[in-house]
From Swiss-Prot:
It is an enzyme of class 3 (hydrolase). Keywords: Hydrolase. This is Uncharacterized hydrolase YraK. Belongs to the AB hydrolase superfamily. The gene is yraK. GO terms for biological process: glycerolipid catabolic process. Disulfide bonds: none annotated. It comes from Bacillus subtilis (strain 168). It comes from the Bacteria. InterPro entries: AB_hydrolase, AB_hydrolase_1, AB_hydrolase_fold. The keyword Hydrolase applies.
Amino acid sequence: MTINNGTLQVPGANIHYQVRGSGPIILLVHGGGGDADKFHHVANHLANWYTVVTYDRRGHSRSNLANQIEGYRVETHSDDAHRLLAKITNKPAYVFGSSSGAVIGLDLCIRHPEQVHVMIPHEPILLQLLHGNELKQAEQFMEDLKKNHRSEVIKLMSRLETDEQSKAVLTKRLLGNSTYFTEYEIQGILSYTLDFEALKTVFTSSPMKILPAGGSASRELFPYRCANALAEQLETEWVEFPGNHTGYTMYHKEFSERLHDMLEKEKKHTC
């Protein structure tokens, strides 16, 4: 598999991105604590049908910030995605976003609907869609995640079977992503309010499609409920994928086939 690497300079950051495959463009937007490599295996499968674009969001791995203490804003990350798509293509693209990446994708839909053909927000972290005890539990989960994420990364790395030099490099990279996630992104994503009226307006007045999605193993968890509630708000189709919140890391082939089948079905509906 040939993977072409590139760098895009955007205001305040250099964005590292990767392109593989051929066919219609699909942009994959990772969640908190990850980077382009989170999608490595699923991107390789998708490259059988698509030109797959992955990237390290600003503040992650190879996408360096000009200001290391820059605050996190969904709108800034959305603008990065807009600029990256504009560099790659002048046509509407498929966009898949996971977790906080799904929120970034939805913000992109509001600001640049002309760039998005189909948006798949997979378990978006949108606590504004939750109420009562469900909301309280989600808030507590995010607080616990903020406290424990770094130690979980260290545990994960301790179980990794690779040489010590490679492990040291990867540990430094993932801990850097974890620091950005816990110190900036969690608060930023929780402070963000999605403009549902604006989203509904572009959803109903443009050819763009939004297909919220959740993992079949996540049904009892709040991100799944966020995706389900989003589908209810938009009165649109609801899609289920294999696995949990990060099912694409465990079920590469099944996940990519589900995504491809879904997009093929959508293409037939619009023909």
